[in-house]
Amino acid sequence: MIEATAIGISLFLASLTLHLAMLRLAKKVSPPGVAPANLRLTAGSLLVLLSHMLVAVVFASGFAWAASLGLGDFAKEPSMSAMDYYYFALITVTTVGLGDIYPTEHLRVITGIASLTGFILISCTAQYVYKTMNHQQN
């Protein structure tokens, strides 16, 4: 469990660093008064979407690595492909949690950390969108 927690925290830190860098880039791409408001918001939103998709890649890689270390497996799939890991990470990070693929053993710890990470990053994104739209209205 300590190994899984350490991996989960490492993935959280990598994801947070990536997402904050992408938010800074989105702010540079969408400063007030430089381009039409809708274009700025669209460009910034695309970068934020890319950030969330890359965070899913980070966690998918972490899930695959942790599974290869024997920290658990995924039920409902005889063998996980790269797409399965990405799909599971994306569903987990967005906190949708469909349940068609689910982790066993210590991978559940990493899954919980992935969900918390996604919730935190979605909150950061909501703040970015709110501030961007608020600047456009003023």
Where would I find each of the regions flagged by the language model?
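N-terminal signal-anchor/start-transfer transmembrane helix
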Residues: 7-29
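Pore domain of cation channels
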Residues: 10-15, 83-137
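Alpha-helical transmembrane segments of polytopic integral membrane proteins
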Residues: 19-23, 55-59, 63, 122-126
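Membrane interface segments of multi-pass transport proteins and intramembrane proteases
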Residues: 28-40, 69-73, 138
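Interfacial helix-start motif at the membrane-water boundary
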Residues: 42-56
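Outer-pore turret/helix-boundary of cation channels
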Residues: 54-86
